[in-house]
Amino acid sequence: MLKQFFFICIFFALVSHAQVAGTSIFSFLNTSTNARQTALGGKTLNLLDDVDQPTWNPATINSNLNKQISANYSSFLAGISIGSVSYAHNFSGIFKTFHSNITYVNYGEFIQADVDGNETGTFNASDIALALGTSYQIPNSHIYIGTSVKFIYSSIANFSSTGLALDFGAIYYNALKPYTFSLVMRNIGTQLSTFNGESENLPFEVAIGASYLPENLPLRWYLTVDNLQQWDISVPNPSNQTTDLDGNTTEEEISFIDNALRHFIIGAELFPKRAVNVRIGYNFRRGKELQLQNVRTFGGISFGFGLRMNKIKLNYAYSRFHSASNVSTFGLSIDLNKNRTEIAPTKY
């Protein structure tokens, strides 16, 4: 089974070479809106019991998510509001379960001025993405593949841009094993219309993930390695630059190991199957890029909790970006399936 999963990984790697590197538009697509995922470091790919997870890995769409709806909201940095709504529903046929999601970002109101700096009014900016996906089990295997299509709309004042993107995912899941493995390729697509006639790339990303639940320990571990399509993601931190007696400035030198670690996100969930659970995560890249010299800011750390009451789940996450920048994310999930009297075991 794992051999099949390996060949799927090879196929995804070949497809990824067709994507063009460089700056990108619609970067909000790579911002987590889910409170549970945010608490686990900001990016997980292996949550099988969360109706928001298919937004990041469509292979996790499964029949146990039927009639579950979730809403998340966060008052992000600089007064930006970001949120999402997800829903899954079962149908008959080879593609049994479909998943839908709406993600929005409201950047707020800005002062509009002419070339001389004279204020002429105000304008707004916002983003929205609509997604629909499904999954399929490869016959006689424990491998599941999924895909979703996204329509994207972005507006700044009187200018707007639209785009179309695809996500592909694969997951190895065996109910008798304590581990899962995932591979995703996200935001494969193009702009349908541009802001100023110049086409830009979408924020294409390749990532792998894993989870592990020890047999006698109620602590599930999560690991995500992101941005595999681009090895060097290092950005020198201005607070780590040095200046000599002549006033010459030297940027921070980032080592091979330092750059490698910036691809890693780790998380842990205590009592993952209980009514109350606690989560913590660490994003290495965020911690390094927002680090202050000689000051412990705890940037990159996130934590939160989940509370389940019958068919309602409440989630909260606290993300530490900087000593002056922290974000709280709230989530509410409701199981609308009246025939389900208890939480079913995770299965497809």
Features from the language model and the residues they span:
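Positively charged n-region of N-terminal signal peptides that target proteins for export
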Residues: 1-4, 140-141
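Sec-dependent N-terminal signal peptides
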Residues: 4-14
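Subset of outer-membrane beta-barrel
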Residues: 19-348
